[in-house]
């Protein structure tokens, strides 16, 4: 019985360990210099993007995004989780349920699915955004009610937020 249980555990753990490797079985190379940037209708025009890998309309993808200084993507959430890896510039990511995070060149942040946040590019930003599912964006008002991008861009009221917990840039890793 013990042998059967141990064998089952080994098989299950091996399957879990191999799943990410099997998810992408082709090498991908996307030189930034050759990226073709364009606007996306659901993102303010101050942000442009280029797909580095995958198809963001269908599933997991890596997107290269450039934003101008002062660009704000108002309060929103995504159905998929996302990871941001900063290449250049700096930004502030406000969190509905936490302290704002200041991002700088070389920084990384993981945002789980449906995490309500707002992105402000403090100095011209370039970063990679990796999603674990199809890309979408749901803008919300200060009470968390879903609204259009135009309404979100016009809104001036701050989001009702949880108490600040400190700036993550000061954390030791």
Q: For the regions a protein language model found, what residue spans apply to each?
A:
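Conserved short histidine dyad/triad with adjacent acidic residue
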Residues: 58-78, 110-113
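Short acidic-glycine-tyrosine-enriched beta hairpin
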Residues: 55-57, 91, 96-114
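A short, N-terminal "cap"/entry segment at the start of jelly-roll beta-barrel domains
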Residues: 21-61, 144-173
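Ligand-binding loop in jelly-roll beta-barrel domains
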Residues: 104, 113-137
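Bacterial N-terminal signal peptides
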Residues: 7-17
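Glycine- and acidic-residue-biased ligand/ion/polar-headgroup-sensing regions
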Residues: 68-71, 78-97
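Positively charged n-region of N-terminal signal peptides that target proteins for export
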Residues: 1-4
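Short beta-strand His + acidic residue motifs that chelate non-heme Fe in jelly-roll/DSBH
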Residues: 73-75, 93-94, 111, 116-122
């Amino acid at each position: 019985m013990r042998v059967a249980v141990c064998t089952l555990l080994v098989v299950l753990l091996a399957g879990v360990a191999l799943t990410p490797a099997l998810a992408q079985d082709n090498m991908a190379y996307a030189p930034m210099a050759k990226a073709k940037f364009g606007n996306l209708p659901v993102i303010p025009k101050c942000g442009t993007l280029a797909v580095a890998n995958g198809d963001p309309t269908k599933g997991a993808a890596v997107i290269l995004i450039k934003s101008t200084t002062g660009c704000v993507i108002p309060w929103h959430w995504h159905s998929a989780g996302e990871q941001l890896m900063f290449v250049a510039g700096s930004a502030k990511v406000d969190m509905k349920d936490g302290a704002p995070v200041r991002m700088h060149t070389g920084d990384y942040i993981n945002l789980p699915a449906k995490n309500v946040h707002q992105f402000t590019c403090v100095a011209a930003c370039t970063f990679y955004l990796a999603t674990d599912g199809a890309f979408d964006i749901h803008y919300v008002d200060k009470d968390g009610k879903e609204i259009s991008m135009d309404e979100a861009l016009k809104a001036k009221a701050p989001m009702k937020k949880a108490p600040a917990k400190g700036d993550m840039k000061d954390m030791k890793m």
